[in-house]
Amino acid sequence: MKILVVDDFSTMRRIVRNLLRDLGFTNTFEADDGKTALPMLQGGSYDFLVTDWNMPGMTGIDLLKAVRADPKLVNLPVLMVTAEAKREQIILAAQTGVNGYVIKPFTAATLKEKIEKIFERIDKA
């Protein structure tokens, strides 16, 4: 499985990649914002996207909107990992089509649980 991790904070990208590796996901790539990530997604065959919300250039919610508007990417599973904990933002992400939402800080167990739930829902669909 090919996973793209998008966050403007390199330490957070590294933390997420290490947690994913510990969960058995070793084919991971990084981008530092949505502007960098979108062409990578459009040109590569990614199976999963993990993105932050607050980033310069293109925010995670704008990246999510672009992914859902692209016929080739519309079904890409997206997990948002963010400090944004306001109810309105969680609702907006859900309405925009996010598959899962994790609020920072989080544990490996939380990340694993969210990823597994996303794949359970996809398998049932």
Could you describe each region identified by the protein language model?
Residues 55:
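Receiver (REC) domain active-site loop signature in two-component systems and cognate sites
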